[in-house]
Amino acid sequence: PRAMGMLDEPSISRQWVARRLQRALSIERWCGSLREGFARKPDRLGQILRTHSCNAESRALSLESMIRATGSEPYGSWGLGFKSAARLGGSILAHLSLRLKYETAELVAKHTLSEYVSLVAFLEDAPGIDRALPDAIEPMQVQTLYELEELNKIKLEI
């Protein structure tokens, strides 16, 4: 028999799941605003990043619902000023250099994907969690992987 760990207790496990979902939500909000700023420059990459920003907002809304389903309430670590600052930063980067905009967008996509990979791995082992939750997260992970692959195709053009 294996020793029981702290996360084997279902109530603690649910709290950790809510925190991991909140972390993914914060990343989506921040990265979505940054991508929205990148999209202010009307080039092909900007159009793609506008779509990625809309996808991030959609995923964020889903994550909020999932957080509520775990019995928690999503907290706002991003206000209007925060979103505006991220958008402005993205807009400034977008106008400085196409390569810099691309490299930053790629880092954001990799970071977002890694968060979903970690979240899915964590959820698979978490006791007391509805097994439908990892299944609901997986399409988000696939979508972020597709976004990264889409950026990698553009890399060949730059």
Q: Language model features by range: what are they?
A:
Residues 32, 60, 64-67, 89, ...:
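A structural signal for well-ordered alpha-helices, especially hydrophobic packing surfaces
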Residues 17-39, 84-138:
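Acidic/histidine-rich alpha-helical segments that form the ligand environment
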Residues 52-55, 109, 139-140:
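Transmembrane helix-bundle signature of multi-pass membrane transporters/permeases
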Residues 43-81, 151-154:
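Conserved alpha-helical segments that form or flank metal/cofactor-binding pockets of metalloenzymes
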Residues 1-5, 65-100, 107:
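Carboxylate-rich helix-loop segments that flank metal/cofactor sites and access channels
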Residues 1-21, 158:
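Terminal targeting/low-complexity segments that flank the catalytic cores of oxidoreductases
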